[in-house]
Curated annotation (Swiss-Prot):
Primary gene name: JPT1
Keyword Phosphoprotein: yes
Expressing tissues: Expressed in testis, skeletal muscle, thymus, prostate, colon, peripheral blood cells, brain and placenta.
Location of Phosphoserine modifications: 28, 31, 71, 80, 87-88, 92, 131
Assembly mode: Interacts with the complex composed, at least, of APC, CTNNB1 and GSK3B; the interaction takes place with the inactive form of GSK3B (phosphorylated at 'Ser-9').
N6-acetyllysine PTM sites in chain numbering: 148
Function: Modulates negatively AKT-mediated GSK3B signaling. Induces CTNNB1 'Ser-33' phosphorylation and degradation through the suppression of the inhibitory 'Ser-9' phosphorylation of GSK3B, which represses the function of the APC:CTNNB1:GSK3B complex and the interaction with CDH1/E-cadherin in adherent junctions. Plays a role in the regulation of cell cycle and cell adhesion. Has an inhibitory role on AR-signaling pathway through the induction of receptor proteasomal degradation.
Region entry Disordered, spans: 1-154
Family: Belongs to the JUPITER family.
Organism the protein comes from: Homo sapiens
The protein's name in its UniProt record: Jupiter microtubule associated homolog 1
Lineage of producing organism: Eukaryota, Metazoa, Chordata, Craniata, Vertebrata
Cellular-component GO terms for this entry: cytosol; intercellular bridge; microtubule cytoskeleton; nucleoplasm; nucleus
Length: 154
């Protein structure tokens, strides 16, 4: 007499079958051809990661209000924010004179020691410092951030 094995499906109590694969996490990936309303987790920024903490904790200096001043790392935060702004402007092709922005940040930093009453320090010259990020030349064709595009436009 011949024995026939029956296929049981995704029943958790059945024996493991090589025909049915369950996704990690134990859910079922069985579909009858129509989309069931499943709730996707909503993330504000798909590039955000919880490695660095929540986005509210790690706001850039340009996102902070002008009245809130941190104690020590304000200059570093402002320079990193300025570099991010420079890189976004370089990718868009719209170049602005960044020396004026650098002067504004320097004036804010040079006014702080005078307001604290430390007259022992030497006065800092207000000479403009060249920006560390030089604007890149505008390419004749733009490629997407990931590499080359197969789309040819003239």
């Amino acid at each position: 007499m011949t024995t026939t094995t029956t296929f049981k499906g995704v029943d958790p109590n059945s024996r493991n079958s090589s025909r049915v694969l369950r996704p990690p996490g134990g859910g079922s990936n069985f579909s009858l051809g129509f989309d069931e309303p499943t709730e996707q987790p909503v993330r504000k920024n798909k590039m955000a990661s919880n490695i660095f903490g929540t986005p509210e904790e790690n706001q850039a200096s340009w996102a902070k209000s002008a009245g809130a001043k941190s104690s020590g790392g304000r200059e570093d935060l402002e320079s990193s924010g300025l570099q991010r702004r420079n890189s976004s402007e370089a990718s868009s092709g719209d170049f602005l004179d960044l020396k004026g922005e650098g002067d504004i940040h320097e004036n804010v930093d040079t006014d702080l020691p005078g307001s604290l009453g430390q007259s022992e320090e030497k006065p800092v010259p207000a000479a403009p410092v060249p920006s560390p990020v030089a604007p890149a030349p505008v390419p004749s064709r733009r490629n997407p951030p990931g590499g080359k595009s197969s789309l040819v436009l003239g």
